[in-house]
């Protein structure tokens, strides 16, 4: 965060980018700060986001998909929906952009030390959960946590993000990695079935556990009752919200849900907190 | 005016009691002096609050389309024409609309009264025939109605409603007596540079609150051009070109449809004389196309029809 | 200068001129039905007889359009943003009403929250602007500051509070900057310290005027009993789910008059603009009344209709802000929205409706409510 002026982005360059899906609606950008000192001082936590800035076009709040354990480059997976994101999709390696952040509160992973962690991801909402998983599985952190379960689903195989990462987890014995698609498909070697169904099969015990849940509304709607049936309390479940944002620091007044600003008090909220806020999101 | 209020209440209570309408859109007393508030009465008891004073400004047709159901609307001449407008523009069905026709003797301009009071606070206004009595903590002054009438009411050409399902009073003289085309001379006499200077000066105090747009019954686009971001048609800053572009574009969208009701001018918190634009639009439509907006449900709007002998002159 | 000083009313222009050394001095001026802060011109003099300005003075610290950053669009520096430097202009606003001053104090807490959320533009302008208030001796019908933790002679947010005593003006310092400012005034004109018999009389007169002003508000049909008490007790979910909102919203035009004239509304939009080889990132006042305010690029909008947006405004003022600011209402009772709303939607009535509905609404089924009487 630029101390003198929180509206001033740090200059950065696009290192490389690739489209994640055949329809090219999602593009993962690898970004490097122009100034190594900035890179060193940019300390972030899984679950935080940054405002990606293109001077002349505007800014877009994007979750940080990389983990701080992966070095000073940042990964952002951008969905092309409007003016700024279209311009982000059109960037070429070497092009300049701005990064303003880190913003938001991030997942409360340090507070969950000692617990079993269940991660439930659907569609391209998996972006900041990639950051959480990579962080958790880093040798410096893994031993501080109990069982780690990763449940991730998409409509079809080509819509699954980051196969280079989760395929590696499949072979590990310190993580239960379940990747699923909606309907059976030739050549698919993992699970078939909606995410809530897989969650039900896993039936994670509530005792000493916490869950990070990010996905489309339908997935959330059917997954939360599974947790409830297993005796999970709202304080144990964490979700990440999105909203239209501008300042990103809780001043411009636009992204609030109830008395909480998604950009500053969130984007991560426990289910218990969300239950106290008006459901206006 | 008291007789008007009585009649409106009678009609509204009957329509609601007989369940001929779901709601009656009219006015009730304002919470501050010199104001009347738009009000939706849904029961005969609520209809008892309906009133009619010289401060029933704004244009109820603006709210009519959004309320849904079968609606009765208290409408003077200009409002009734805008009701024709929203029916023609498919925002409301004629069969869902009951027009409570209110022949209008012209509305009062609270700002004119305030200016004449030179800082003394007004606590009440009484309207009796042609006299308007303004009272304060320690004063009482009487004006002729014409002295404090709204400008567009002075030059109104259609004071009797063009639609009427219920009638509140006998028809009144159709025009306000003033010469509407005299206002146009403000523009006509000037060369283009001087016109631009007047245009710029008129909107110097604009704060882009969009009250003019939101008070206007013509502005019912699902997404206003101002709210588009891809592409974005105009800047949102206070830079002069952006402010002027907004007003210019909106004026062109209203051209040929504007009834010069003055709701925009009443709504503007900065007191901008919006009518400098709307009166010109109205006059140009009459002069160039022989058309006055929304006088009947059957007449086609001037700019929605092409005829080979249309004048080449554009709205200027 | 620690204590208050009494000056002759006729000396005020001279004092303002003295304060104008190195500063731009603004005073309220009335033209027709509009009152606005304008640059003080000694030749035009000034009047202490005005209600309040049509627009709030927040634009002095939070301009409607403000450039945040600049950048080049071409060349090796393309895309590199630089902070827009603020001018060194010092200002003094004379005639700020206590309600607007309280709004400045409230906005201080919005624009300067903590290390991460400090707006340098507000902070700098605030530091460079001195506020001399004018106590209210004759509140307007629409004033209700006393119901919003304020008062006609309150000093919160001001550097000096002036009180019009007729032939004399009492200047009361509030802050250290105010004390220094008062010393400057004492150099320009003869100020009698407000102590002893003479001082006591003046202070007594000011007190009488204060009580008179409060009595005027107490006599308003809207003010007595107007309180946030029940709203603060109930959960935000309960207040949000009250059945009153559709009726309140149905005649609202969803324009931006209330938000733009309001001294505590602070929402803004950030946009980029380019022209040729250069560009700027600029912020503009925005309004929660607009559909675009919360519209996601995907097309989803958490506040899709007028009802949600109208509810948001009143929830923000009377529930969310007090929750975040230790109970301080988000409204200062200046009455501008009441006077200027084209549809005459009266915030005092809305609060009363919220209050009554909160007293009788049953406990929220989903979560235990804080206190239901």
Residue ranges and their predicted role:
Chain C
Residues 1-236:
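Iron-sulfur-associated redox domains of electron-transfer enzymes in respiratory
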């Amino acid at each position: 965060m630029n101390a003198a002026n929180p509206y001033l982005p740090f200059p950065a360059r696009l290192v490389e980018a690739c489209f994640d899906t055949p329809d090219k609606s999602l593009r993962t950008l690898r970004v490097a700060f122009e100034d190594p000192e900035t890179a060193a001082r940019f300390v972030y936590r899984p679950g935080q986001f940054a405002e990606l800035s293109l001077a002349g076009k505007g800014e877009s709040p994007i979750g940080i998909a990389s983990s701080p354990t992966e070095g000073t480059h940042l990964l952002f997976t951008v969905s092309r929906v409007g003016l700024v994101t279209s311009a982000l999709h059109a960037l070429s390696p070497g092009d300049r952009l701005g990064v303003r952040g880190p913003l938001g509160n991030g997942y409360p992973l340090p507070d969950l030390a000692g617990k079993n962690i269940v991660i439930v991801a659907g569609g391209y909402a998996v972006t900041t959960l990639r950051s959480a998983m990579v962080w958790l599985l880093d040798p410096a952190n893994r031993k501080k946590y109990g069982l780690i379960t990763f449940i991730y689903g998409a409509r079809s195989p080509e819509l699954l993000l980051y196969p280079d990462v989760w395929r590696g987890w499949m072979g590990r014995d310190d993580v239960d990695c379940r990747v699923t698609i909606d309907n059976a498909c030739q050549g698919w070697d993992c699970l078939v079935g909606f995410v809530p169904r897989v969650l039900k099969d896993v039936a994670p015990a509530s005792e000493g556990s916490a869950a990070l849940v990010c996905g489309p509304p339908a997935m959330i709607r059917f997954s939360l009752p599974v947790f409830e049936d297993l005796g999970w309390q709202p304080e144990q479940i964490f979700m990440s919200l999105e909203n239209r944002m501008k300042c990103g620091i809780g001043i411009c007044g636009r992204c609030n849900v109830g008395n909480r600003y998604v950009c500053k008090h969130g984007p991560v909220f426990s289910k218990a907190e969300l239950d106290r806020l008006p459901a206006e999101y | 005016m008291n007789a008007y209020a009585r009649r409106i209440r009678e009609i509204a209570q009957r329509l609601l009691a007989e369940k001929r309408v779901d709601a009656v859109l009219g006015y009730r007393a304002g919470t501050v002096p010199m104001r009347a508030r738009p009000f939706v009465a849904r029961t005969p008891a609520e209809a008892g609050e309906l009133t009619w004073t010289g401060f029933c400004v704004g244009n109820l047709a603006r709210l009519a389309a959004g309320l849904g159901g079968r609606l009765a609307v208290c409408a003077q001449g200009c409002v009734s024409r805008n009701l024709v407008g929203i029916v023609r523009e498919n925002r409301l069905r004629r069969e869902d609309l009951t027009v409570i026709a209110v022949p209008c003797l012209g509305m009062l301009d609270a700002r004119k009264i305030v200016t004449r009071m030179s800082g003394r606070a007004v606590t009440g206004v009484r309207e009796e025939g042609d006299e308007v009595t303004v009272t304060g903590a320690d004063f009482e002054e009487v004006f002729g109605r014409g002295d404090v009438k709204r400008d567009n009411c002075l030059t109104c050409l259609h004071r009797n409603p063009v639609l009427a399902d219920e009638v509140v009073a006998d028809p009144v003289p159709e025009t306000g007596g003033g010469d509407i085309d005299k206002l146009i001379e403000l523009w006509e006499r000037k060369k283009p540079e001087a016109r631009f200077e007047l245009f710029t000066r008129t909107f110097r105090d604009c704060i882009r609150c969009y009250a003019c747009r939101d008070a206007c019954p013509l502005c019912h686009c699902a997404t206003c051009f101002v709210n588009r971001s891809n592409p974005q048609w105009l800047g949102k800053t206070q830079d002069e070109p952006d402010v002027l572009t907004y007003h210019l574009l909106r004026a062109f969208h209203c051209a040929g449809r504007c009834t010069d009701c003055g709701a925009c001018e009443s709504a503007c918190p900065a007191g901008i004389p919006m009518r400098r634009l709307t009166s010109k639009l109205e006059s140009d439509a009459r002069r160039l196309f022989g058309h006055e907006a929304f006088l009947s449900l059957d007449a086609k709007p001037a700019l929605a029809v092409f005829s080979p002998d249309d004048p080449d002159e554009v709205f200027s | 200068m620690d204590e208050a000083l009494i000056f002759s009313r006729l000396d005020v222009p001279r004092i303002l001129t003295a304060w104008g050394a190195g500063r731009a001095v603004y005073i309220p001026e009335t033209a027709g039905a509009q009152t606005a802060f304008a640059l003080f011109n000694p030749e035009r003099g000034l009047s202490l007889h005005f209600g309040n300005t049509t627009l709030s003075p927040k634009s002095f610290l939070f301009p409607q359009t403000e450039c945040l950053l600049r950048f080049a669009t071409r060349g090796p520096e393309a895309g590199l943003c630089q902070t827009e430097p603020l001018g060194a202009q010092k200002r003094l606003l004379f005639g700020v009403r206590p309600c607007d001053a309280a709004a400045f104090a409230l906005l201080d807490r919005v624009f300067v929250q903590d290390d991460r959320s400090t707006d340098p533009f507000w902070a700098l302008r605030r530091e460079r602007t001195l506020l001399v208030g004018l106590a209210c001796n004759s509140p307007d019908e629409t004033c209700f500051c006393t119901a919003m933790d304020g008062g006609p002679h309150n000093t919160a947010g001001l550097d000096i509070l002036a009180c019009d005593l007729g032939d004399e003006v009492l200047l009361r310092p509030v802050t250290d900057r105010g004390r220094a400012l008062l010393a400057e005034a004492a150099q320009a004109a003869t100020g009698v310290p407000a102590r002893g018999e003479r001082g006591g009389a003046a202070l007594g007169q000011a007190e009488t005027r204060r009580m008179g002003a409060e009595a005027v508000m107490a006599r308003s049909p809207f003010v007595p009993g107007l309180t946030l008490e029940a709203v603060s007790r109930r959960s935000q979910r309960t207040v949000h789910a009250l059945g009153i909102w559709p009726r309140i919203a149905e005649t609202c035009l969803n324009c931006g008059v209330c938000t733009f004239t309001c001294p505590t509304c602070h929402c803004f939009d950030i946009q980029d603009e380019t022209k040729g080889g250069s560009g700027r990132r600029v912020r503009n006042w925005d309004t929660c009344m607009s559909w675009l305010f919360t519209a996601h690029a995907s097309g989803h909008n958490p506040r899709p209709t007028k009802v949600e947006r109208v509810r948001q405004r009143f929830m923000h003022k009377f529930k969310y802000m007090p929750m975040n600011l230790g109970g301080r209402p988000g409204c200062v009772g200046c009455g501008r929205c009441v006077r200027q709303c084209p549809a005459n939607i009266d915030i005092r009535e809305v609060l009363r409706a919220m209050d009554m509905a909160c007293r009788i609404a049953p406990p929220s089924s989903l979560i235990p409510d804080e206190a239901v009487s």
